[in-house]
Structure formats: structure tokens, C-alpha cells
């Protein structure tokens, strides 16, 4: 999964005991929009429902706010809405804890059920404030993504219905009996809806049972975390539902011992889920959305723990940062969002939301089409052309286009704060390519090397992202340069987006990768990155030069080109991992050079061989595509050198030259011509020779792994597995 909106955070401060080990922590770049949503729902609740402490002890924290860390890849334009929804849920939950009879469960649940079924919630003058808030929130979400907004309302209604059971007194016989009830009571269904809406995910209905099964450890870990930290807040409630209380009663122990039991269970469930994420991402029998959902949900686990350690909701007296204090005292009208949305697409059909959720009018803000002045429920005028990001939008015609009124055009020309165009267009070709199936071989190589190098998770993640961007960019450019119609059995990127957009997207990834390299902890990492990038371009230049001029290189020249081109990425990731390793002063990257060279050479020669001999490869890339491209593969070089050295094959040499010239003129070869070339290769036994070289290199790779295991004093099973996967 590509991470567009978040960065890795060192979680050692928040989890010194390592309870969430194996699960990273990420922070959303647009976290300020969460605060705006939270303070907006607080203002609406006080106006429409009743008194509320200020600031409210909900999702916000002085350093870590809930959604910013638990949904780090939420589409930015949806972040304020799900923040509003979450704190609405917290406020309603607090009412249930204090007095379930006065919490209006049937009214709220009925409103949400109607919203889930019809896409709207009926309201009138006599409607409760909670119903009005739910109705307005649903309208905002429907404007962004109708299908997922209705799914959210439906799942939230199920959670509210379950909360009604809290009035029942329960005599739990065991923790395992308590857990299923509490997991549902936790607000899991509401949270499921928020995440799928926020990240624009739809898990297929036929995978629902599998989704619940895979997610179970994460839900349990979050439930136990919630109960652990909320115990002090809830222990004096009328009807507390808390694991600490249950454990104390069942085990007949004190608070501290019960809390340790909670921590132990959290550690176990986190370890389970970390393994589930890893296994799920490697599966090929489930949808991409289910994979994405399971991967995203791991941040609910780590983010929930980090938030719980410092949030005012669980810690008294609560701490707030300065901006939160100002917004609590003066309102979000005076202190609006500081984050400027780059894009306003709804994630479904690329439709732009107009003002959407960011109106500053409180609960009755409008979409502001045509820039008309509207009145809210209290009769106060508001200008719908001002959104939550604090800038005026240009006047719009009824068709939603820029006004051509002279004053408006001049105002636009003088406006230095126009919204950014965003990177959505430049990323489209890249996102298409990365959505195609991939074996993730380079990620496997990084993880295998880390068995020895112990690189911190932040640097490891950055290197993986960097290598992915470079590899994807090179594939996009290679397909253009080689005129390849297929990539992984799908149309190549340039076939869909055109050469110009694909080149622009690919080069943008190079700039992104450079930025990532500059952010690595070792200052030498950027120099390593630039050195290897230069080698990649030089290697590619020879490949293109030989193809364009129909010049057959020697085996020596071919291998050197492979070292710089294909082997370059393996060498780069190896050198970067060594540079970022805590023991880099004791490890010379030269010690790993033979391995990276061998992998690069084996990988390329294997690719050459499969292009000519594998039916699956033909399905993925086209029949004997290297001959269409005019590439001088290892097998073709051997064939040419063999016929040139054998006078008995003079006629085959003439035919081979004729085919290569024809390919250059026509831009490809017919299947009949390709079959003739394969026939010549059969006579020279070039495929057999290539297979023999591959098997010899395989043995050398295995010996090199053994040598390195001796050097590092540790067996490396992931590396051996990776090498074994390459066998032909």
C-alpha cells in the first residue's frame, strides 16, 4: 500500500514496554483538520443538545490526537467529518455511562438506521438536537461519498443498538466470555464505518466473514487498551463495563495485578495481528480492498495505545496544547483550519466537493454554491464562500465555473492564497502501476538483510518506499523505451495515460525518492542514493544504445550493464541498509557487494530466460517480447556469438541478422519470425546454455549466503527462502 498522507513516528516514547511491537506508528499530515472537526461538534452539541465541558475530553490530545494517528491514510477532505462523527460518538457514549435511560438511544439509533437505509435522516422543528446533528453530518458525508456514507450510518446504528444492552447487569464468568460483548460495545461497528469511509475502502460482501476473522486480534487489543486506560475514569460509573473490573472479580486480585493481566493480553493480541498483516499482504486469494483494510487497521492498534497514554479523556487533570486552548476559548471561526486541502476529490468518481465539510457555519453550514449569503438556524448571516481553511473561494456561476465578471477575475489574479492543485494528477500513472500484482521481491530482500543489520523500522520503511518509487519509475520509463504493450498481464502505464503523462509521473517519483533519501538518518545515505542513480542511468544508456544501433555487446559488456542497471537497485538498497544500521561502523558495504552483484545478474539472466521460455511470462508481457523490443538478452548474445563462430551456421547467421534489422525497421517481429529465431536458438542450444549458467549462479548464491552467515554469525532463513524462490 502506498502511504500518501502520513509519516512514520518513533513510538518508543509512547510504548516503552513494547506492547505493540511489530506494528508501526504513523501520523497524518492533515491532523489539524481533526481538531477543527472536534471543536465544531463541541460547539454544535452545546448549542443543540446541552452543556459540555470546555474543552471536551474526547479524541484530542496535547501531542497525539486520535484520528491523526489511528487513520493516518484518511483522505484529507474526509478527516474533519470522521473527527466530528467520532467525538459525537464519544459524547453519546459518555451519556450512556452516566445515565443510559436519558441517552435517547432509540432516537439516535433510529435516525442512523434511517440514514443507512435511505441516505437521509428526517428532521423537523421538534427533532432532538442529536438527531439534527446526525442529519447534518450525514448530508456532509453523502456529498463526499454516498455509498460509504450510508454504510457508515448502518454500521453505526448497529453499534448504538448494541449499547442498549449495557443496562443489563452481567456476571461474567471469564475474561473470554466478557471480550466478545465488550468488543462490540467498544464502538467497533462505528469505527469500522469511519475507517472505510475515511479511506474509501469497500470490502466485498463475500469477504465479510474473513474480514472479521482477520481483524479479531486488533479489536481485542484495542478493547483491552481502552479498558486499561479508562478504568480510573469509569470505575465509579453506575454500570461499568471494564476488563480490569472483570479480571479483579474473577481472579480475586487488586487493580495493579489486573492491569498487568490486561497488558499481557494486549501484547499477545498485537503480536498476532502483526503476523496477520504480514500474511494477509502476501495472499493472492483476497481483494485488494481487504488487504488495504487489514493493513490500515494496524494503525488503530498502535495509534490507540499512543493516544491513550496522554489524552485528557483518560488522564486528570487534562493537558491541552496552546492552539487547542485558543480554539476552546474563542471558537474555530476565529482559529480556523491551518491545513489547506490540496485536493477535494471524493475518492469515488473524482467529483469535487464544494465547501463540503469545511463550512464555518456550525451544524447548518451549506455548500455555498454561487457564493450566496445564507442564514443559520439562529438567524446569523454567514458567507458560504469562506470555507474551513480560511480563504474566500472565487465566485461561481450556476454551472460551477469561474466567474468572468471583471472584478472577480482581477480578484483571482491578485489572490496569493489560491488552493493548491495537488499531486493527484501526477500520481495517477504511478498509482495505476503500483496497483498491479507484484511479488514484492525487493521488500523481501530488505527484510532479509535486516536479519543481520538491525536497521530501525523508520529507516527500513523509508528505504522500502524509496526503492519502490525508483523501481516503479524505472518500469514506467522502460515500457515506453521498449514500446511494451503489457505489464503484469495488464496494459502498460503509457498505453493508458500516454507517454508524456507517464514520463512526468515517473520523473516525479525520482524527486520523491530523492527527498526520502535526504530524510534518512545517515548523511551519507543521500550520496549513496545519487551515486547509484547515476549508475542506473549509465547502465540503461548502454542497453538503449545497443538496441537502437543493433549492436551486439560481449558477455562482459552485458554483465557490466546488468551490474549498473538491474543490480543497481539491489546494490543501492544494500548500501542504504548498511548506512542506516546501528553497526554501520563495523560493517563494510563491500562485504555485501558480491551478494548484490550475484542477485542482480541472476535476476536479469533469469528474466531473459523466462521471456523466451515461460508461458506465464508470455501471458504477462507478450510472446517473446524481448525480440520485439530488440533487446540483446543473455540468450540472444550467446546465440549470435555461436553462429558467428561456426561456419556451418552461416545461413542461420544471415537469417538472424535479417530478423534483427527487420525488427528495427518495423518496430517488432511477427510470431512466425519469432518462431524462426527460437529455432535458431534451439540449434545453438542457447536456452540450455542459459539454464546451465543460471543453475551455476544459483549455487554461487547459496554459497555466498553461507559465507555471509558465517561472517555475521547468524543464520538467515528469509534470505535463503528468497534465493530458493528464484530457482528455475
Curated annotation (Swiss-Prot):
Q: Which keywords are on file for this protein?
A: Isoprene biosynthesis, Lyase, Magnesium, Metal-binding, Multifunctional enzyme, Transferase
Write down how the cofactor binds this protein: Binds 4 Mg(2+) ions per subunit.
> Which residues bind Mg(2+) 3 per the record?
478, 482
Entry binding sites for Mg(2+) 2: 93, 97
Q: Per the Swiss-Prot or TrEMBL record, what residue ranges does the short sequence motif NSE/DTE cover?
A: 226-234
For this protein, what reaction is catalysed?
A: isopentenyl diphosphate + (2E,6E)-farnesyl diphosphate = (2E,6E,10E)-geranylgeranyl diphosphate + diphosphate; isopentenyl diphosphate + (2E,6E,10E)-geranylgeranyl diphosphate = (2E,6E,10E,14E)-geranylfarnesyl diphosphate + diphosphate; (2E,6E,10E,14E)-geranylfarnesyl diphosphate + H2O = ophiobolin F + diphosphate
Q: Which pathway is this protein engaged in?
A: Secondary metabolite biosynthesis; terpenoid biosynthesis
| InterPro entries xrefs | Isoprenoid_synthase_dom_sf, Polyprenyl_synt, Polyprenyl_synt_CS
Q: Where is this motif: DDXXD 1?
A: 93-97
Which N-terminal residues, if any, form the signal peptide? none
Motif DDXXD 2 per record, residues: 478-482
Q: What is its EC number?
A: 4.2.3.145, 2.5.1.29, 2.5.1.81
Which segments carry the region annotation Geranylfarnesyl diphosphate synthase? 323-728
Say yes or no: keyword Flavoprotein present: no
Binding locations of isopentenyl diphosphate: 439, 442, 471, 488
Q: Where does Mg(2+) 1 bind?
A: 93, 97
Q: Where is the composition biased (Low complexity)?
A: 362-371
Q: Which amino acids does the record list as binding dimethylallyl diphosphate? A: 487, 565-566, 604, 611, 621, 631
Q: Identify its protein family.
A: In the N-terminal section; belongs to the terpene synthase family. In the C-terminal section; belongs to the FPP/GGPP synthase family.
| Role | Bifunctional sesterterpene synthase; part of the gene cluster that mediates the biosynthesis of the sesterterpenes ophiobolins, fungal phytotoxins with potential anti-cancer activities. The first step of the pathway is performed by the sesterterpene synthase oblA that possesses both prenyl transferase and terpene cyclase activity, converting isopentenyl diphosphate and dimethylallyl diphosphate into geranylfarnesyl diphosphate (GFPP) and further converting GFPP into ophiobolin F, respectively. Other sesterterpenoids (C(25) terpenoids) are found as minor products of oblA.
Q: Which PANTHER family match?
A: GERANYLGERANYL PYROPHOSPHATE SYNTHASE, THIJ_PFPI FAMILY PROTEIN (AFU_ORTHOLOGUE AFUA_3G01210)-RELATED
Full protein name:
Ophiobolin F synthase oblA
Q: Which organism is it from?
A: Emericella variicolor
Amino acid at each position: 500500500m502506498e502511504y500518501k498522507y502520513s509519516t512514520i513516528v518513533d513510538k518508543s516514547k509512547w510504548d516503552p514496554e513494547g506492547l505493540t511491537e511489530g506494528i508501526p506508528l504513523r501520523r497524518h499530515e492533515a491532523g489539524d483538520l481533526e481538531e477543527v472537526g472536534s471543536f465544531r461538534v463541541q460547539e454544535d452539541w452545546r448549542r443543540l443538545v446541552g452543556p459540555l465541558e470546555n474543552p471536551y475530553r474526547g479524541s484530542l490530545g496535547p501531542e497525539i490526537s486520535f484520528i491523526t494517528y489511528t487513520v493516518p491514510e484518511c483522505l484529507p477532505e474526509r478527516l474533519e467529518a470522521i473527527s466530528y462523527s467520532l467525538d459525537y460518538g464519544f459524547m453519546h457514549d459518555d451519556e450512556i455511562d452516566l445515565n443510559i435511560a436519558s441517552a435517547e438511544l432509540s432516537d439516535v439509533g433510529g435516525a442512523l438506521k434511517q440514514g443507512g437505509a435511505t441516505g437521509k435522516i428526517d428532521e423537523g422543528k421538534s427533532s432532538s438536537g442529536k438527531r439534527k446533528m446526525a442529519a447534518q453530518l450525514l448530508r456532509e458525508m453523502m456529498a463526499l461519498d454516498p455509498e460509504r456514507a450510508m454504510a457508515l450510518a448502518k454500521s453505526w446504528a448497529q453499534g448504538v443498538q448494541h449499547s442498549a444492552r449495557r443496562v443489563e447487569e452481567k456476571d461474567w464468568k471469564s475474561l473470554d466470555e466478557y471480550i466478545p460483548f465488550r468488543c462490540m460495545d467498544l464502538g467497533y461497528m462505528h469505527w469500522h464505518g469511519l475507517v472505510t469511509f475515511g479511506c474509501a475502502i469497500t470490502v466485498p460482501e463475500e469477504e465479510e466473514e474473513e474480514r472479521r476473522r482477520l481483524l479479531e486480534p486488533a479489536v481485542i487489543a484495542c478493547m483491552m487498551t481502552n479498558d486499561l486506560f479508562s478504568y480510573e475514569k469509569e470505575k465509579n460509573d453506575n454500570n461499568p463495563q471494564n476488563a480490569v473490573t472483570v479480571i479483579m472479580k474473577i481472579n480475586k486480585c487488586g487493580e495493579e495485578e489486573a492491569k498487568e493481566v490486561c497488558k499481557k493480553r494486549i501484547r499477545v493480541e498485537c503480536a498476532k495481528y502483526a503476523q496477520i498483516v504480514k500474511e494477509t499482504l502476501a495472499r493472492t486469494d483476497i481483494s485488494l480492498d481487504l488487504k488495504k483494510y487489514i493493513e490500515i487497521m494496524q494503525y488503530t492498534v498502535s495509534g490507540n495505545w499512543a493516544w491513550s497514554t496522554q489524552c485528557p479523556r483518560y488522564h486528570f487533570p487534562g493537558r491541552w496544547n496552546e492552539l487547542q486552548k485558543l480554539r476552546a476559548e474563542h471558537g474555530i471561526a476565529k482559529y480556523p483550519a491551518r491545513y489547506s486541502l490540496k485536493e477535494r476529490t471524493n475518492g469515488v468518481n473524482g467529483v469535487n466537493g464544494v465547501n463540503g465539510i469545511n463550512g464555518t457555519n456550525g451544524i447548518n453550514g451549506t455548500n455555498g454554491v454561487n457564493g450566496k449569503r445564507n442564514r443559520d438556524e439562529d438567524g446569523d448571516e454567514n458567507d458560504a464562500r469562506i470555507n474551513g481553511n480560511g480563504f474566500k473561494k472565487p465566485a461561481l456561476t450556476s454551472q460551477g465555473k469561474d466567474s468572468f465578471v471583471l472584478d472577480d477575475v482581477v480578484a483571482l489574479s491578485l489572490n496569493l492564497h489560491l488552493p493548491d492543485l495537488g499531486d493527484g494528477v501526477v500520481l495517477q500513472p504511478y498509482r495505476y502501476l503500483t496497483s498491479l500484482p507484484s511479488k514484492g521481491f525487493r521488500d523481501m530482500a530488505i527484510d532479509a538483510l535486516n536479519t543481520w543489520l538491525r536497521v530501525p523500522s523508520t529507516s527500513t520503511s523509508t528505504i522500502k518506499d524509496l526503492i519502490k518509487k525508483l523501481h516503479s519509475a524505472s518500469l514506467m520509463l522502460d515500457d515506453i523505451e521498449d514500446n511494451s504493450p503489457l505489464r503484469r498481464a495488464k496494459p502498460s502505464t503509457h498505453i493508458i495515460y500516454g507517454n508524456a503523462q507517464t514520463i512526468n509521473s515517473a520523473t516525479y517519483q525520482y524527486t520523491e525518492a530523492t527527498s526520502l533519501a535526504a530524510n534518512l538518518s545517515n548523511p551519507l545515505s543521500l550520496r549513496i542514493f545519487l551515486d547509484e542513480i547515476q549508475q542506473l542511468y549509465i547502465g540503461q544508456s548502454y542497453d538503449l544504445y545497443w538496441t537502437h544501433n543493433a549492436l551486439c555487446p560481449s558477455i562482459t559488456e552485458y554483465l557490466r550493464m546488468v551490474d549498473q542497471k538491474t543490480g543497481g537497485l539491489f546494490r543501492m538498497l544494500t548500501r542504504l541498509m548498511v548506512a542506516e544500521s546501528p553497526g554501520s561502523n563495523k560493517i563494510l558495504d563491500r562485504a555485501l557487494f558480491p551478494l548484490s552483484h550475484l542477485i542482480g545478474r541472476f535476476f536479469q539472466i533469469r528474466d531473459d530466460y523466462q521471456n523466451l521460455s515461460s508461458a506465464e511470462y508470455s501471458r504477462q508481457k507478450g510472446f517473446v517480447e524481448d525480440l520485439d523490443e530488440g533487446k540483446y538478452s543473455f540468450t540472444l548474445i550467446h546465440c549470435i556469438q555461436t553462429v558467428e563462430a561456426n561456419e556451418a551456421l552461416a545461413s542461420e547467421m544471415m537469417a538472424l541478422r535479417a530478423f534483427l534489422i527487420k525488427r528495427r525497421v518495423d518496430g517488432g517481429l511477427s510470431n512466425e519470425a519469432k518462431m524462426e529465431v527460437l529455432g535458431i536458438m534451439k540449434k545453438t542450444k542457447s536456452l540450455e546454455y542459459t539454464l546451465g549458467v543460471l543453475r551455476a549462479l544459483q549455487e554461487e548464491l547459496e554459497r555466498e549466503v553461507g559465507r555471509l552467515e558465517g561472517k555475521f554469525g547468524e543464520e538467515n532463513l528469509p534470505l535463503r527462502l528468497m534465493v530458493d524462490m528464484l530457482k528455475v
